[in-house]
UniProtKB/Swiss-Prot annotation:
The family this protein is said to belong to: Belongs to the TMEM231 family.
Species of origin: Danio rerio
PANTHER family: CHST5 PROTEIN (PTHR14605), TRANSMEMBRANE PROTEIN 231 (PTHR14605:SF1)
Gene name linked to the record: tmem231
Protein name (record): Transmembrane protein 231
Keywords: Cell membrane, Cell projection, Cilium, Cilium biogenesis/degradation, Glycoprotein, Membrane, Transmembrane, Transmembrane helix
Lineage: Eukaryota, Metazoa, Chordata, Craniata, Vertebrata
């Protein structure tokens, strides 16, 4: 008749000793090394406490339809300008040119958020005028919601010049987010939810592009045009307006943030346990060798009771 194993379990052998013995001291040392050493190893290997993390998010970006346009019309420094701010237009005087503007935001991937801005500006020029340089400042509403809620006003600055007069400028780029410090992991961040340009101010310094950019760059959170590809077209027909075409994409951003308490603990716990398992395996085999071979004297308790005959 053939036999086979239907069930198996390990036999538990106990080793007993008094409190004040070398075996007790050995067990205490092993326990300390088993559970404290992994903590030291994980901490000294750097990155134990998670201080900074990141995630991807598609921002909610809306063009605010506020802009400042400056153009140089000859080599002597004559210029034309226009903006959506009445006070600025009054300061320009005879250099004011009112353009035709068409703006459209599209949701390419149908996720409910705009992905690209298509902007078309047609600037009228006098017959004797030519366009050598263009500066264009656009404002946007920028929002994030996945971790902390960020609501702010941002801008994009476009600039291009050429020694040869042109008839059209085409610009293509991505509106990218800049962070100087990580965001908090939760809460409302609306410090920069104010207009980048104070349209109610009657002073010319308020609309100076140098001042606007200088103050804007002092912020922790800003946006800029990245990967800009300008195309300058020459050969303008008489009495034809100068055309500005911009295609600005709103890409998915990698947002840096400071992790919360529980995320930090979770990350540290994973590192600690991964090292702890190695120490548990090593010291378990060391203890088994020590007590099985009675290197330290103990009383062995067999796994089965001895029955009297």
């Amino acid at each position: 008749m053939a036999f086979y194993d239907v069930y198996a379990h390990p036999a538990l052998i106990r080793y007993r000793t008094c409190v004040c013995t070398r075996a007790t001291l050995f067990v205490c040392v092993v326990l300390g090394l088993t559970y404290i050493s992994p903590l030291l190893v994980a901490y000294r290997s750097q990155g134990f406490w998670l201080k900074r993390n990141s995630y991807e998010e598609q921002p909610v970006v809306k063009f605010q339809y506020d802009l400042i346009l400056l153009g140089v019309t000859d080599t002597t420094g004559n210029y034309l300008a226009w903006s959506t701010f009445p006070n600025f237009n009054r300061l320009i005087g005879d250099n004011l040119r009112i353009p035709e503007i068409s703006a459209q935001e599209e949701d390419k991937n149908q996720d409910g958020k705009s992905d690209v801005l298509l902007l078309q500006i047609s600037v009228p020029l006098k017959p004797a005028e030519q366009m050598f340089s263009v500066q264009l400042l656009l404002t946007f509403s920028y929002q994030l919601f996945r971790m902390s809620t960020v609501v702010m006003q941002t801008l994009a600055f476009i600039q291009h010049s050429s020694p040869v007069p042109g008839s059209q400028l085409f610009i293509c780029g991505d509106l990218r987010l800049n962070q100087r410090t990580p965001l908090p992991h939760r809460g409302l961040h609306s410090t920069y939810n104010v207009s980048v340009i104070d349209g109610s101010s009657p002073f010319a310094s308020t609309y100076d592009l140098t001042n606007i950019i200088r103050l804007y760059q002092q912020r922790n959170l800003t946006t800029h045009l990245s990967g800009v590809i300008p195309v300058w077209t020459v050969g303008r027909a008489a009495n034809a307006p100068f055309q500005i075409s911009a295609q600005i994409h709103y890409p998915v951003e990698m947002i840096d943030y400071r992790p919360g308490f529980w995320e930090t603990i979770k990350f540290a716990w994973i590192q600690y346990v991964s090292v702890l398992l190695i120490f548990l395996w090593v010291f378990q085999h060391i203890q088994t060798f020590i007590f099985q071979n009675q290197v330290l004297p103990t009383i062995t308790i067999p796994p089965f009771k001895q029955h009297r005959s």
